Design a protein with these regions (language model features):
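Prokaryotic Sec-type signal peptides and long signal-anchor helices
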Residues: 16-17, 65, 103
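Aromatic-residue detector
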Residues: 1, 6, 40, 57, ...
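N-terminal Sec-pathway targeting helices
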Residues: 1-20
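Generic low-complexity, intrinsically disordered sequence content enriched
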Residues: 5, 12, 25-26, 48, ...
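Alpha-helix initiation/capping motif
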Residues: 2, 77, 144-145
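Extracytoplasmic electrostatic interaction patches
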Residues: 102-198
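Residue-level signal for well-ordered alpha-helical segments
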Residues: 7, 46, 51, 118-120
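N-terminal export/targeting and maturation segments
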Residues: 21-98
């Protein structure tokens, strides 16, 4: 009897360790967030771990932060509860020469033809470059010419909605006007209806 209790105790212990390791493995890649601009290149630099998502190489965001700019805000979040979601934004002001150089770089990017997705009717500042996909979201850069300021935003996700509550992280003034990628958004509702009709 003692031998059976020992064997069961060892099995129970190993089972708990296995479950703990499984949870640790799953949780470690579920959430990755930074607001530390010193980590920018680690996340979005040329070799950044989130420079390419869903087959889209993010050349809209700069590869490096120019030395002569004043970063106003930065946030990057990777979240993967079941499917990956990416949220990022960078806001900086710069001198007129840097502004003109970056404006030209962005203007030379071949943007998506369809820019108004998920209810978007316009953008709050001049749109310089944009990648959109009606399934996975958008990446775009805005120019606030009055203040020599650039705003870069990434909102990428799966299944026609963003698991990240993006409105809690990105100020509304940087989001497309009318944009709705919440779980119950009208575009997702329509796409799911069409999917289930087939």
């Amino acid at each position: 009897m003692k031998k059976i209790v020992k064997i069961l105790s060892v099995i129970f212990f190993l089972l708990i360790v296995a479950v703990g390791l499984l949870i640790a493995f799953i949780v470690k890649d579920v959430w990755d967030k930074t607001t530390n601009i010193n980590k920018y290149e680690k996340y979005l630099g040329v070799e950044g771990k989130y420079k390419e998502n869903f087959g889209i190489y993010n050349d809209i965001f700069p590869d490096t932060i120019p030395e002569n700019v004043e970063v106003e805000d930065f946030c990057y979040i990777y979240y993967n509860p079941w499917d990956p979601c990416y949220l990022g934004y960078l806001v900086y002001t710069c001198d007129s020469e840097t502004f003109e150089e970056e404006y030209e770089r962005l203007s030379n990017i071949t943007s998506s033809e369809e820019i108004y997705i998920y209810g978007t009717t316009d953008f709050p500042y001049e749109l310089c470059a944009v990648y959109t996909d009606d399934y996975t979201g958008c990446i775009y850069a805005l120019a606030d010419t009055e203040n020599s300021r650039f705003i870069y935003v990434e909102l990428q996700y799966c299944n026609f909605f963003n698991d990240i509550k993006y409105m809690e992280y990105i100020p509304n003034e940087y989001l497309p006007i009318g944009y709705d990628a919440t779980m119950g958004n009208p575009y997702r509702t329509e796409m799911m209806r069409k999917l289930y009709e087939k």
